Regions:
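Transmembrane signal-anchor helices characteristic of membrane glycosylation enzymes that use polyprenol
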Residues: 100-128
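Extracytoplasmic catalytic/substrate-binding loops of multi-pass membrane glycan-assembly enzymes
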Residues: 123-137, 143-176
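Transmembrane-helix signature of membrane-embedded glycosylation machinery that interfaces
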Residues: 17, 48, 181, 204-213
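Membrane-interface helix caps and helix-loop-helix hairpins in membrane proteins
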Residues: 52-55, 121-123, 230-238
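Membrane-embedded, hydrophobic transmembrane alpha-helices
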Residues: 1-94
Length: 249
């Protein structure tokens, strides 16, 4: 339950952050960007908590997330307004004017995403980078309630990690995102890459839809998903999918 609450809070914060960034996003773009932006913001907040020597517990990270959400609400209300968040009938034009080709493409996109998401959540992390660094560091950070001072970084315990190329030199944000779900009680970190890919697909379609017709946007999205590496990206790699999603967006 805490994991679901944390993910919802992260998405809502990301949704508000799109309102801070600009007012011309479509709802498809806002939804697609909500999780990547929200998780980026959440990991920054967790890093700040760690710098202030506040233990990373479910209470502290959710409380900090709630404070961040309230702050974003204030900024949007004070400086941007909520007019751009209004839901109008024009947003349903794609469905009202749907053609058979577009509907079939959307069904195929949904099936490919379901296949990818299911496989991602079923198989545990298996790639070397995750097991040697990202996933392991996230799990240990959740157990130690800190990233900077975690036991794996102890020179006496693990001297090799301080050598050139050691995982201690990696930017902590991927590991922090994994630690976030582990702190909230998740059994695996695979929900992060699975959701990253899901929201990336939504944002990809939304950005294309802004500049092209709905059928072309759906066809291009399907072609992107069916590329050999992208078809099972999040189910096979728990690290690269996050960087790829953010770079493309």
């Amino acid at each position: 339950m805490l994991v679901v609450s944390g993910i919802i809070l992260t998405c809502l914060s990301g949704l508000l952050l799109t309102g801070v960034i600009g007012t011309r996003f479509s709802w498809t773009e806002r939804i697609g960007l909500s999780f990547p932006l929200g998780m980026t913001l959440q990991t920054v907040v967790m890093a700040l908590l760690d710098l202030m020597h506040i233990p990373l517990t479910s209470f502290s990270v959710l409380s900090a997330g709630a404070v961040t959400f309230a702050l974003l609400m204030f900024i949007v209300a004070r400086y941007r307004g909520f007019e751009s968040f209004r839901i109008t009938s024009a947003m349903l034009d794609d469905w009202k004017q749907a053609n058979l080709v577009w509907v079939l493409l959307i069904i195929l996109i949904g099936y490919c995403e379901y296949m990818n998401f299911s496989k991602c959540m079923f198989f545990p992390p298996s790639d070397r980078d995750s097991l040697a660094a990202f996933d392991t560091l996230g799990f240990v950070a959740a157990q130690d309630h800190t990233y900077m001072r975690m036991s794996l970084f102890d020179t006496d315990y693990n001297p090799s990690i301080h050598r050139a190329g050691g995982s201690i030199a990696y930017a902590p944000f991927v590991q922090m995102s994994y630690a976030y779900v582990y702190i909230l009680g998740a059994e695996t970190s695979k929900s992060i890459p699975a959701l990253m890919y899901l929201f990336f697909v939504i944002a990809f379609y939304g950005i294309l839809r802004r500049n092209t017709g709905k059928t072309v946007a759906a066809l291009s999205t399907l072609f992107m998903m069916m590329a050999p590496e992208m078809l099972a990206f999040s189910s096979l790699s728990t690290t690269n999918v996050m960087q790829l999603s953010l770079i493309h967006i």
